[in-house]
Amino acid sequence: MGRPTERRPAAATAAGVEVSVVLPAYNEARTIENTVRVTVETLESFLPADAFEVIVAEDGCDDETPEIADRLAAEDDRIRHYHSDDRLGRGGALERAFEAARGDTLVYFDTDLATDMRHLEELVERVRSGEYDAATGSRWMPDRVADRPRKRGVPSRAYNGLVRLFLRSDLRDHQCGFKAFSREAFEALRDDVEDNHWFWDTEMLVRAQRAGFRVAEFPVDWEPKGDTKVDLVRDILGMGSQILRTWWQLTVRPRITRRVTIVAGLLLTVLALALMTLYIDPSEVISVLGDADPALVAAAAVIYVVSWPLRGIRYREILRELGYREKAGFLTGAIFISQTGNLVFPARAGDAVRAYVVKARRNIPYPSGFASLAVERVFDLLTIAGLAGVVLVGLAATGGLDDIATVLATGVSGGSVDVSADDVRTAAYVATGVGVVAILGVLGIALSARADRNVVRAFVGRFSSDSYVELVAGVIEQFVSDLQAVAGNRAAFGRVGLTSLAIWTVDVVTAVVVLLALGVDIDPVVLVGVSFFAVSVGNLAKVLPLSPGGVGLYEIAFTVFMAALAPVTPAAALAAAVLDHAVKNAVTIVGGVGSMLSLNVSLTTAVEESAEVRDREHELADSK
């Protein structure tokens, strides 16, 4: 990216400058000269001639705006041209220009002069006088005159309402391009403001209020210029996501301590298990568990251990395609630690731990760590969805689909168990939806890897011409390119795919041995087939990270389909699901503790530092 540079006469000086007015400009060749001249004339009407400067913050224009700005700067020492080769975004351009500004009162307004310039003196003096630290014009206050067409007014009211609701702002209008800040307020807030685009000034105003700065809002006369329509990328993906991001940072995250996170996760787990008692008598389950064969339970644990080196090998292959070569043993330990984190913390917070471990111990960059994890998750979903699909084909060939149709229509009942048809259908729909999305996603990525044109940027560009397109498209492209490195390479796809198949086959075999440990006596072919289906659907059902380790979510899905498709009582099916999950979680915890000791990693520290890393990565992404 080209660095912003200033184009101005060498003779210009900073002496006496009190007010700096920034005009953010992108392809404004038709209007910029008139805007600059009107601005200078208006400032001269209430300020000494040498007390102000006007900065044209030209943001990667591809028309004649740079040449016009250069000429204006050459004609008047009070006019400066601040140039960027690439698009910084409106917020980025403003921030860079304010950094270079000489005045202690920093002002900006839109170059279309939609706000009546007779209000400029009031805007400047509100801050210059020291009465306020920030000031903004408002099109929604009483006594204002704003000819806002419905297509602008409705979205604007909705946006400002959301900002007031979620971010607890006292202002009525955050979007009016007519604002001023004191140098002190700008310097205090600039490092906290993360957005570089259209949300920048909203975030400045919100954070200014939170920090205790005095913010003035006054009515202005405003007349729209040009034709503006709703921009999907800017208004929804951009502005909407930034409201949620700021709300999370200011309101939610300060309340989420490590203790609160653990307690919330445990409560979710207990709640999920408690809800299952509405369908199944716990005493019946405990009775079945008490009859389990200890030797076979131990055998199930040993079998499950085999899947972990396979996970390390798969992760090695993924990282190799991204350009990093590591030993499978170390990577197995990193996976153990991250999966242990997922058992302790909700919302799959343990996933971020792996990126921390490989960065701290092998210096693999955080973006690559997160990308490799995403690749692994996609292949997991693809594999278990494929396994479930294969079993469905087998059921169709043998007439077993009738059993699924029956359970979808009537639910599952027997003994003390009574699961409604609606609940069964919900589980089936969620699992099917996740599976279909995984398969279509991988197919799309594999096909796009062979395409010459930039599909992502072309697709996003259909919805917006705003600078947010660069940010959104860049994030998506980085993620997709890492997936393409594996999915688009036949050899890599085959290696990672076969390893994933082996991992989940071991997972299913573990469940089969657990069922045998509980004395389940059914045809081996049926046992294996139904186990593949129940385990696959159970894991698809726990994709949503609502409880640590998916406890409760996996059990109920496994129970429903095992009881529906095999001659197994619902109580025995639930007991198998609970024991199967317990065995796997026990192996994970033992391996995780051992790996933490061998790699000298604190789990809680890793979770906290990885969360901080994710925040820094978002900041870096916004600054690019």
UniProtKB/Swiss-Prot annotation:
GO biological process, one term: protein N-linked glycosylation
Cell location: Cell membrane
Keyword Hydrolase in annotation: no
Residue numbers annotated as active site: 201
Entry EC number(s): 2.4.1.-
Effect listed in the UniProt record for changing residue 133 to A: No change in activity
Pathway per the UniProt entry: Cell surface structure biogenesis; S-layer biogenesis
Origin: domain of life: Archaea
Keyword tags: Cell membrane, Glycosyltransferase, Membrane, Transferase, Transmembrane, Transmembrane helix
Variant or mutagenesis effect after changing residue 138 to A: No change in activity
Membrane topology, record value: Multi-pass membrane protein
KO phenotype (gene knockout): Mutants exhibit defective or limited motility.
Recorded coiled-coil stretches: none
GO cellular component: plasma membrane
CDD domains listed in its UniProt record: DPG_synthase (cd04188)
Documented effect of changing residue 201 to A/N: Loss of activity
Family label: Belongs to the glycosyltransferase 2 family.
Job of this protein: Involved in the assembly of a N-linked pentasaccharide that decorates the S-layer glycoprotein and flagellins. Catalyzes the addition of the mannose found at position 5 of the pentasaccharide to its own distinct dolichol phosphate carrier.
Name this protein carries in UniProt: Glycosyltransferase AglD
Species whose genome carries this gene: Haloferax volcanii (strain ATCC 29605 / DSM 3757 / JCM 8879 / NBRC 14742 / NCIMB 2012 / VKM B-1768 / DS2) (Halobacterium volcanii)
